[in-house]
Amino acid sequence: MSIELRVLELGQDDPRKCTARRLARMELARSYPAPARLPPMGIALDPFADRELGQVGGLVGVDCSWNRATETFARLRLHGLEPRRLPPLVPVNPVNAGKQGKLTTAEALAGALAILGERAHAVQLMGAFKWGPAFMALNFPEEAL
């Protein structure tokens, strides 16, 4: 089963450059002109939502075995934590180097900080590890930010 894609087209961009309009035209996504017309329970992709949440409740790095991660994270949802998935990041730690997504707690926290615009904090965090600067250089090259 595929996830249905919807776009809220507010007409604020140049229509010739609007990727949402192109997706709708190609029938790869369904376009909606107003939020009230969207079906309930959709996930709005809001790059600022997690930043506010992080400033209020902080970031929680979960230090658990990858062998027990599924059950561990299922239990955490019961405690009112807001789960978020990081985009694919490549670890450089000695244990799981190169195994996409298998981050250490420190890499996950640094990745989240960098995504939320706290690059200096992420760099400081990764400075505690010999391999830390390589993680930042690989996943968050300065020219890309």
What are the roles of these predicted feature ranges?
Residues 75-145:
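C-terminal folded domains that constitute the principal catalytic or ligand-binding module
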Residues 1-56, 66-68, 76-86:
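N-terminal, charge-rich interaction modules
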